[in-house]
Each structure stands twice: as structure tokens, then as C-alpha cells.
Amino acid sequence: MAAAALRGGWCRCPRRCLGSGIQFLSSHNLPRGGSSYQISRPGGELTLTKSYSSGSRKGFLSGLLDNIKQELAQNKEMKESIKKFRDEAKKLEESDALQEARRKYKTIESETVRTSEAIKKKLGELTGTVKESLDEVSKSDLGRKIKEGVEEAARTAKQSAESVSKGGEKLGKTAAFKAISQGVESVKKEIDESVLGHTGTYRRPERLRKRTEFAGAKFKESKVFEANEEALGVVLHKDSKWYQQWKDFKDNNVVFNRFFEMKMKYDESDNVLIRASRALTDKVTDLLGGLFSKTEMSEVLTEILRVDPTFDKDRFLHQCETDIIPNILEAMISGELDILKDWCYEATYNQLAHSIQQAKALGLQFHSRILDISNVDLAMGKMMEQGPVLIVTFQAQLVMVIKNPKGEVFDGDPDKVLRMLYVWALCRDQEELNPYAAWRLLDISASSTEQIL
């Protein structure tokens, strides 16, 4: 009966169950729709209960089969689409319109090839004909004469060119031509320097030097003149008296201040006509300024010549542009106090050194640089009680940058160019008899504008 029951579908392990003495609670077949069955050992030692259902939930194999069927169906649709596309392409390939277009293209291509070959052949025939004609002409008397005439003309032209070249060399060696050439070069150089404002690209001195160091090499070659106190009528004095007298003059003289205010506007103009007019007015002033009246500038220059007969205004301005200004200005923007102290009078040095000393006390570093120095000019002169003072104006392009100990920008802008207009008062040091080291900075003033380009 147990075997029959097993064959009925409700137990699949008859040997194991019967051998272990498991008692079947029911001999009825388990329903297919879902129920529960129990298996118990005699004595109630083991009871196993299992519930199952065969609802709408699909098994793993059933889902896998469904996916395979869907993929096959999609592959079948794709194959049908590819087949239809190939059929359409084949119909297009075999269409009359496409066949006709191909025939026309082949016809045009063959015609083009034949035309090119015909043109090439005609050009070859024409070239041969022209060559034969030229050979015949060259063999005739007329052709020989034409050829000889061309050769003669070429020889004549060559001889003429050689004659002109030799004549130019002879002209270039004449004294008159040399004088004219030198004059033209001088005028050109003068115009360039006056209009453009400088003679070359600015270069920082290899080493900032003091006045005595700068004059050392020239001192051996130059004659030093002693001061004639009887002719001058003055006695050597200290820096403080010089500076105090200059300050009184500068602060109380309205004409002086108005003059420099107008000159700043005039010199700062970038208009080409104004720059050209500056050059013209400067030259006319130099030539005619001292002919009709005894100006204060002439008195100052005369007084300087009494002490230094070799003094020349143009040479002095060149010295300012290439030596005096670069050394002092580089020392100012880089914080070189020793250089400043040697070039400046005491009051001016104290004024400049104060801000530098404060910056160094904070550990700040100077990274400024000078790009250009131009338009160096002798604006005016002033006779002080102790000696002559020359006021020099010039323009400088600077990049002002100060960094903290971490290397960060503390003040200034490394990408901003400043155009500075300086007014310097230079005094001849009465205690220094060497003319190349006699000038010191008595006072300084400046105005700045941002350079756009």
C-alpha cells in the first residue's frame, strides 16, 4: 500500500521512509494545487511539516526558456529586416536610372582622357614648330644681327653699371661727400634722440657704485681743479645749510612751482607734434637763450665753469642718464642704503631711508625694477649762497613690487607699469674737487601715472 501510495505521487523516498519506521499520517494523494503534508516517526520523536504551492510564480528554468524564446524571436525579426534591406539594395543596383548614370559617367571620363591626349599632342607639335622657326631665324643674317645687338647691349649695360659703381666709390671718398654724410647722420641721430627721448635700451648697472668708486678710473686721466675761494667769494659749508636754503627757495618761490607744474604737463604729453616741438624749442633755447639776456641759467653755468673748466652741459646730461640717475634710482627701489648715503645729502638721505628701514624691519623684500629712463633734461639752474644748483627732469618706467617673507606680493603689482616724472635738484659738492664725483642729490620730487601700453 505504501508503494502504491508512493506511486500515487505524494512520497518519493519509500525505502528511506519505510526503513526508518516513519508513519504516514494519510494515505491520500497530496493535491496538485498546493497544501501541506506531515511525516512523523512512531512515538512522536520526529515531526516534519512542509507546505508548498504551485501558484503563478515561475521557476528559474522557465524564465530562462522564456528569455531564449524572446531572443530567438528578435533575431528572426532582425534577419528579416536585413533580408528586406538587401532586397531593396539589389533592386536599386539593378534599376535603369542607376545603370544609365554609370554609362554617362564612363562616357564623360573616356572623352576627357581623349581630349587631354589630343591637347598634349598639339602642344608637342607647336613646340617643335616654334623651335624649328627659331633655329631658322638664328641662322639667317637678320637673326645673327639681332643676336649680336642683344649681346652688345648686355655688355654696354654691364660697363655702365661698373662705371656708376666706380663713380660712386670716388664720390664717397671725397671730403665734401663725407662731410655731408656725417652731417646727415648727426641730424638723424639728433632727431631720434630728441623725439624718441632716449639713445638706447636701458640696462641696469652691473654693480651699484658709490661716487668715489665711479670716479676712480677717470680720476687718473682727468685734471682736478681746486676751488678758487677768492674768485667765488664763498667758503665751504656743511650739508645742512645747503639743504635748508634750498628748501626755503623751493617752498616760497611761486614762479618755480608754477614752472614745474607746466613742465610736467608738457613733458608727459605723448602727442607726436608736441614731442617734435619739444625738440625744436630745446634746440632754439640752447642756441639763442644766452645771446640777448643774462639768464640765471647762464650765471649758474658760468659759476660751474669757474670751478670746473671742462664742464659741458650735454656731457653732464649724458652722465646723468647713464650713471648718476641709474645708480641712485636703482638704490632707491632696491633698498641699498649705503649707495644712497654716498650719493645724497643728509636730509635727502634721511627722507628716503626712513621708509626703506621700516620695510626691512618688517622683513619685506624689494623686487622692483626699472624698464626705461628717458627725456633727461636740464630744466633750470639756481645760484644759492653756497654754490650752483642744477634741476634735472626725466621720465622713468618702473614696475614696483614689494613681497613679504613668504614670497607673496605685499605692495605693488608685477603686471603694472608705472610712468614716473622725476624732478631732481643736483648740487655740486664743494668739498669734492673731482668733477666726476662732485654732484650729489639735494632734493627729489616725483609724480606717477599708470602706463596703459
From Swiss-Prot:
Record keyword Mitochondrion present: yes
Phosphothreonine carried by residues: 129
Binding residues for ATP: 167-174
GO annotation terms (biological process): cardiac muscle cell differentiation; intracellular protein transport; protein import into mitochondrial matrix; response to 3,3',5-triiodo-L-thyronine
Gene Ontology terms: cellular component: mitochondrial inner membrane; mitochondrial matrix; TIM23 mitochondrial import inner membrane translocase complex
Subunit note: Probable component of the PAM complex at least composed of a mitochondrial HSP70 protein, GRPEL1 or GRPEL2, TIMM44, TIMM16/PAM16 and TIMM14/DNAJC19. The complex interacts with the TIMM23 component of the TIM23 complex. Interacts with SLC25A4/ANT1 and SLC25A5/ANT2; leading to inhibit the presequence translocase TIMM23, thereby promoting stabilization of PINK1.
Xref: NCBIfam families: 3a0801s03tim44
Function: Essential component of the PAM complex, a complex required for the translocation of transit peptide-containing proteins from the inner membrane into the mitochondrial matrix in an ATP-dependent manner. Recruits mitochondrial HSP70 to drive protein translocation into the matrix using ATP as an energy source.
Protein name: Mitochondrial import inner membrane translocase subunit TIM44
